[in-house]
Amino acid sequence: MPPWPLPADPVARAKAAGLDVQPMEGTAKHFHAHLDVIVNGKPVKVPGNIGVSPAQQAMSELHTHDDTGMIHIEAPTANKRYTLGQLFGEWQVKLSAAGIGGLKADGKNTLVAYAGGKPLSGDPATIELLPHRQITLVYGPAGAKVDVPKSYNFPPGQ
């Protein structure tokens, strides 16, 4: 159940998600996306330091710095594709069409993914992270009304 904590070894989780880990952020590809998670009508914080190990002075190419939900993609290569499933793999929180973090989409409760305020079909783990893409995951009673953000106010230069 949320909130979901950070994993004990963020470097191992990042590598398991197929991501590069470096002592510095990559510079070949640099953009930001944003994630909101809503469970039973309440926001769940996306923690800072997903994909970051201050102890090992290492950082994944896909990471968070704070709990605003901003996802940083700072990669050493330009042509790699990044997905929401990779972020959740680093976070060590299960994400699939069947549910999120132990919460099952069973008909009574649903998991719906949105991009730019529009519902998406399929497995939310496959959602591609794109520049300034607003992604929202909503879990809760089927048919419940939830205000889904259409966009995020990215700081200048982000």
Model-assigned labels for residue ranges:
Residues 1-158:
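Ubiquitin-like/PB1-type beta-grasp interaction modules and other compact soluble beta-rich domains
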